[in-house]
Amino acid sequence: MSLRVTFLGTGGAVPTTERAPSALFVNREGDRLLFDCGEGTQRGMMRFGTGFGIDHLFVSHLHGDHVLGIPGLVQTLGFNDRAEPLTIHCPPGTEDDLHDLVHAVGHDPAFQIRIESVAPGEVALDADGYEVRAFETVHRTKSQGYVLEEDDRPGRFDRPKAEELGVPVGPKFGRLHEGEPVEAEDGSIVEPDQVVGPPRPGRKFVYTADTRPREGTVAVAEDADLLVHDATFADDMEDRARDTAHSTGREAGSVAERAGAKRLALVHISSRYAADASPIRREAREAFDGECLLPDDGDLIEVPFPDADE
């Protein structure tokens, strides 16, 4: 069961030739989710092969580098004869401005757009096998991040034990794995907990968007399989990061380390590092012992299950 993250835009407020403004495409077993939609997002979708077929758009806040791609994307979806509704999730109090932005091309969209506010701590999307929740961030305007967390999976099935207990090979194996008792060949009843291990955790993906480091993010990102965190500046611009309510690479690394995240991806890289952003990653690595990534636009990460190596 796949969980793929494509980085469509990894840059800060000012685009560069190499980095577009914020946009992140997540494909979870065919469910296609877009997190933020900065200028140039639809071109990134074409260039990096994600396609336009998004089911939900999650907006972190209404700064231009996170939303100015919405009018063009909506127009293109209409040109492509989209018929399915599109749900846009946003922070409370931003619905009217987002509505105006959606209609900025001067006419009504060719398909239904639902704009739904979601407060930090609330579930934005309750889907089959996972949910997406909003969480509070600290920025210069009303903003929030999002966490995608999968349901627990059934434990590992012990086939040798099932055969030893007299369960015939076949459909009864699947019924046991799904939690249903079955009858063995000798007429005895075999319970699932006799042949199925404890539940195994699903995957957790966390996207902060623009934020200062905060304890709340550490809690939300606990044991995250992938944490995508604001890392706009290196240490040489720490005061600037504080003044603009962003994070440095080292601060992002510290959040990831305290959360026990497995992988950290650094995004929202300031244009001042267009020639060389390596100091941001180097400083993050000094604070974080896990895998630390500085994605380029177009990079794709496959998020494995927590027990993939077992």
UniProtKB/Swiss-Prot annotation:
Active-site residues, record numbering mapped to chain: 65 (proton acceptor)
Superkingdom as given in the UniProt entry: Archaea
Reaction it catalyzes: Endonucleolytic cleavage of RNA, removing extra 3' nucleotides from tRNA precursor, generating 3' termini of tRNAs. A 3'-hydroxy group is left at the tRNA terminus and a 5'-phosphoryl group is left at the trailer molecule
Signal sequence residues: none
Keyword Lipid biosynthesis annotated: no
Any Pfam family: Lactamase_B_2
EC number(s) per entry: 3.1.26.11
Binding site for Zn(2+) 1: 61, 63, 139, 210
Details of cofactor binding: Binds 2 Zn(2+) ions.
Record's keyword terms, sorted: Endonuclease, Hydrolase, Metal-binding, Nuclease, tRNA processing, Zinc
Compositionally biased spans, kind Basic and acidic residues: 153-164
Positions with a binding annotation for Zn(2+) 2: 65-66, 210, 268
Molecular function in Gene Ontology: 3'-tRNA processing endoribonuclease activity; zinc ion binding
Role description: Zinc phosphodiesterase, which displays some tRNA 3'-processing endonuclease activity. Probably involved in tRNA maturation, by removing a 3'-trailer from precursor tRNA.
Assembly and binders: Homodimer.
Similarity-based family: Belongs to the RNase Z family.
Protein name (record): Ribonuclease Z
Source organism of this protein record: Halorubrum lacusprofundi (strain ATCC 49239 / DSM 5036 / JCM 8891 / ACAM 34)
